[in-house]
């Protein structure tokens, strides 16, 4: 995503500032692996899923833009918690631009605030018939994998690791893999 470009640009600028050898910099950039919920790719059976951490509207909007860049049917799982590390206030979800949904056939919501994010998505004009609320994460992963199409998962801070673990658990039982991309 564009954030990886920003981060790598910052790395290059600091390397130049401290006169780090160009070959060392090139090696670092070539071997950097994106993981832990940063557009991390999972293959659950024949279903391709991307997990992205979003701690604020900007992060969520970036994932939605990436989704829209893929011209095919897709589904979204949004996992929202309100634990102390997340900040108990989830009002930031009202600043997410859900009006950009294109070819999103279904949205599943999960987490401790699954109903809040479902209401937010419904208020953006998305059909209630296409929103599935499953606070239980394992049930949400199972439901997400039940239909064809590309899958995207947005999770906030404390939801990301449990979501990753649920995906890996599903893979260990049913087949698939985790693909860490070099960027």
Give the residues covered by each predicted segment.
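Membrane-embedded hairpin module used as a gating/binding unit in multi-pass transport
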Residues: 1-19
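ATP-dependent carboxylate-amine ligase
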Residues: 13-20, 27-183
